């Protein structure tokens, strides 16, 4: 009996592993700019993520975050948990825990409707258009009607009533994230996203390796996952335009922003 139960658990774990791998492949297909996420080596349900912001109120910021998928993912309706490991000041991020409120745009998880990449686009959108993220509707005169409650009421009030003060505060945090961008990794997980200063010589060497037949042959076999993800920081106009394009239509003027995630 024990053997049978153990086999069942193994079968469920293997199936879930393939489903999570499919989620990661979907992210690659979406080709999102300036945001990266990868399952940790220790657990397929714990993802590491990082976002670089090049425009808007949060320009110059770099935020790390974790995505915790429910134990029964992708089944069930429980939403994943997103926790920022870099301090963020935003109406939708709880200051005590740095957890992100998904409720404004996700009423519940539906595996046939949502994927992990939707979470990443949502993260991009709240930073690209923080004012749009707290707007419930727009009046005929063009005025925004803001939420009455949010995870961070102080940030909500400041963004609604004093944009200049809000921008100043988040820009102070942006400088802090720049200062600590290359800090020593806080996790020894092989899949932790390591950020290093751009080195043209190293970049050229890696690109040549990727083009070599031996590299293509080695990576065509699913024997072992990559040990590191190296993110190149590029603040060029092209990346800014791509980032803006990703989130421009996410928040609809009529307040039904969730439709943009479909």
Curated annotation (Swiss-Prot):
Highest taxon of the source? Eukaryota
CDD domains, alphabetized:
UEV_AKTIP
- Which SUPFAM superfamilies does the UniProt entry name for this protein? UBC-like
Q: Which Pfam families did the record assign?
A: UQ_con
Tell me which residues make up the UBC core domain: 15-179
Q: Which InterPro entries match?
A: UBQ-conjugat_E2_core (IPR000608), UBQ-conjugating_enzyme/RWD (IPR016135)
Concerning Gene3D superfamilies, the annotation shows: Ubiquitin Conjugating Enzyme
Span of the signal peptide: none
By sequence similarity, the record places it as follows: Belongs to the ubiquitin-conjugating enzyme family. FTS subfamily.
Protein name, as recorded: Protein crossbronx-like
């Amino acid at each position: 009996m024990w053997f049978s139960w153990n086999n069942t658990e193994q079968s469920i774990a293997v199936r879930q592993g393939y489903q999570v791998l499919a989620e990661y492949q979907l992210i690659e297909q979406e080709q999102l700019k300036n945001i990266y996420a990868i399952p940790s080596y220790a657990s397929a349900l714990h993802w590491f993520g990082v976002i670089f912001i090049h425009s808007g109120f949060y320009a110059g910021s770099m935020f790390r975050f974790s995505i915790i998928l429910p134990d029964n993912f992708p089944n069930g309706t429980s939403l994943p948990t997103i926790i920022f490991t870099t301090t963020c000041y935003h109406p939708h991020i709880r200051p005590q825990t740095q957890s992100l409120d998904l409720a404004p745009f996700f009423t519940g998880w539906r595996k046939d409707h949502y994927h992990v990449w939707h979470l990443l686009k949502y993260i991009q959108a709240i930073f690209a258009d923080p004012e749009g993220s707290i707007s419930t509707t727009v009046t005929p005169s063009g005025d925004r009607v803001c939420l009455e409650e949010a995870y961070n009421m102080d940030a909500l009030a400041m963004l609604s009533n004093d944009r200049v003060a809000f921008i100043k505060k988040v820009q102070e945090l942006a400088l802090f994230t720049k200062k600590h961008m290359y800090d020593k990794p806080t996790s020894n997980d092989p899949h932790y996203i390591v950020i290093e200063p751009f080195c043209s010589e190293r970049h050229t060497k890696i690109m040549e390796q990727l083009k070599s037949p031996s590299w293509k042959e080695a990576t065509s076999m699913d024997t072992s996952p990559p040990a590191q993800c190296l993110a190149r920081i590029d603040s060029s106009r092209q990346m800014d335009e791509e980032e803006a394009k990703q989130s421009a239509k996410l928040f609809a003027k009529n307040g039904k922003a969730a439709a943009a995630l479909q």
